[in-house]
């Protein structure tokens, strides 16, 4: 299946149903009074994370999602039916952004997590709500409020503990094949990897971590060269980055300059990402003598001003790979994911019915002083009106 990590969709919540103007009319009951019911609330639009999905390709074709409108109220104090909700399923790791405001509405990081992205409209009130000791035959009602409407950007960001970055043909895909069951394509030409891939590294029956491989970066990636830097977002949730450096590039390029290019593109993309823990890993040491490899790695590290630890491995022959993986595992155990902010309770929207009624009644009384016929709402073609006649 094609990997798609971005999609734009339109979500529209249902409008609230209108209230009804109706009067009870039965034999032998000449003054039955008002019996117009309230409308129903509009349906909501929800996002739900599903671990069985791994791409947003479905939303390249289906771009509009609309919840059901609440039904109008009816006579005999019948309340309109609430509109049905719409649930949009997305892969775990999806970020939801409101394109109108640029606000991040939420990150879907757990299976089954739900996020309200469009709230349905409130229902309108029937004329029964306006009955009082001084208004025995109210002919007023209110219409339902419109539901939310939003243009959303969905961004899929892979959930991994370890992220790999480097130039094309640095050996990233070979490494992930060596340490996990993932089988990304490996070949002797640049940009063999076209989409991100994940691999689970199992150290023993109880210890494991997830590593992410993304397409290689080249100079000018921030301006769109090569495959650009759009895949770097998949590393934002990683706890440590493995910067793979081809210790002896077959094209004769300078490993120091190659490393600086990666660091520069990383900083152009995000200072936060550039500040993440990053380990230097010199790959393909099987192509030269051990002593020569150690001396060359030391020279490269000094040229980069690198003061931390670095690793020498050969992903193809798995030389030094196991030690690196155990060090990664130890780092992950010693640096657990920071406790996310306390799970925010869904925002509770309290609709103050007493205040709402009071406000509506005040408006009705003000209108009644000017013209008793002003509140018939003749523009509402959907509302049901039954008027008691003598």
UniProtKB/Swiss-Prot annotation:
Record-listed GTP binding positions: 166-173, 191-195, 213-216, 283-286, 314-316
Binding site for Mg(2+): 173, 193
Skewed-composition ranges (Polar residues): 129-145
Function: An essential GTPase which binds GTP, GDP and possibly (p)ppGpp with moderate affinity, with high nucleotide exchange rates and a fairly low GTP hydrolysis rate. Plays a role in control of the cell cycle, stress response, ribosome biogenesis and in those bacteria that undergo differentiation, in morphogenesis control.
Protein name in UniProt: GTPase Obg
Cofactors named for this entry: Mg(2+)
Compartments in which it is found: Cytoplasm
E.C. number(s) listed in UniProt: 3.6.5.-
Disordered as annotated region, ranges: 127-147
Main location, first listed in the record: cytoplasm
InterPro entries: G_OBG, GTP-bd, GTP-bd_Obg/CgtA, GTP1-OBG_CS, GTP1_OBG_dom, GTP1_OBG_dom_sf, OBG_GTPase, P-loop_NTPase
Source organism per UniProt: Salmonella gallinarum (strain 287/91 / NCTC 13346)
MF terms (GO), sorted A to Z: GTP binding; GTPase activity; magnesium ion binding
GO annotation, cellular component aspect: cytoplasm
Key words of the record: Cytoplasm, GTP-binding, Hydrolase, Magnesium, Metal-binding, Nucleotide-binding
Biological processes annotated in GO: ribosome biogenesis
PANTHER family: DEVELOPMENTALLY REGULATED GTP-BINDING PROTEIN-RELATED (PTHR11702), MITOCHONDRIAL RIBOSOME-ASSOCIATED GTPASE 2 (PTHR11702:SF31)
């Amino acid at each position: 299946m094609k990997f798609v990590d971005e999609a734009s969709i339109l979500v529209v919540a249902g409008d609230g149903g209108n209230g009804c103007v109706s009067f009870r009319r039965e034999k032998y009951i000449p003054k039955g009074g008002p019996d117009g019911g309230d409308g129903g609330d509009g349906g909501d639009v929800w996002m739900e994370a599903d671990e069985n999905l791994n791409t947003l390709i479905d939303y390249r074709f289906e771009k509009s999602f609309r919840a059901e409108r609440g039904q109008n109220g009816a006579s005999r104090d019948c309340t309109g039916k609430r509109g049905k909700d719409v649930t949009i399923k997305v892969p775990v790791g999806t970020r939801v952004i409101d394109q109108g405001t640029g606000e991040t509405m939420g990150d879907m990081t757990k299976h089954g997590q739900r996020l309200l992205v469009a709230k349905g409209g409130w229902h309108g009130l029937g004329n029964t709500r306006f009955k009082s000791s001084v208004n025995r035959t109210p002919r007023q009602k209110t219409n339902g409020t419109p539901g939310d409407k939003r243009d959303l950007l969905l961004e899929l960001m892979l959930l991994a503990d370890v992220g790999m970055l480097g130039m094309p043909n640095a050996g990233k895909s070979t490494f992930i094949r060596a340490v996990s069951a993932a089988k990304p394509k490996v070949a002797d030409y640049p940009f063999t990897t076209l989409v991100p891939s994940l691999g689970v590294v199992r150290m023993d029956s109880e210890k494991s971590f997830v590593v992410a491989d993304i397409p290689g970066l080249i100079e000018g990636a921030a301006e769109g060269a090569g495959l650009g830097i759009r895949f770097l977002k998949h590393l934002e949730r990683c706890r440590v980055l493995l910067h793979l450096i081809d210790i002896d590039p077959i094209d004769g390029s300078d490993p120091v300059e190659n490393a600086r290019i990666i660091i520069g593109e990383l900083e152009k993309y995000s200072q936060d990402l550039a500040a993440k823990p990053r380990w230097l890993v010199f790959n393909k040491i099987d192509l030269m003598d051990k002593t020569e490899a150690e001396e060359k790695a030391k020279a490269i590290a000094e040229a980069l001003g690198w003061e931390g630890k670095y690793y020498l491995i050969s992903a193809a022959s798995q030389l030094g790979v196991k030690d690196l993986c155990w060090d990664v595992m130890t780092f992950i155990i010693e640096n657990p994911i920071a406790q996310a902010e306390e799970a925010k309770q869904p925002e509770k929207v309290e609709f103050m019915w007493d205040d709402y009624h009071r406000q509506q009644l005040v408006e009705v009384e003000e209108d009644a002083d000017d013209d008793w016929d002003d509140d018939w709402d003749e523009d509402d073609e959907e509302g049901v009106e039954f008027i008691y006649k003598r």
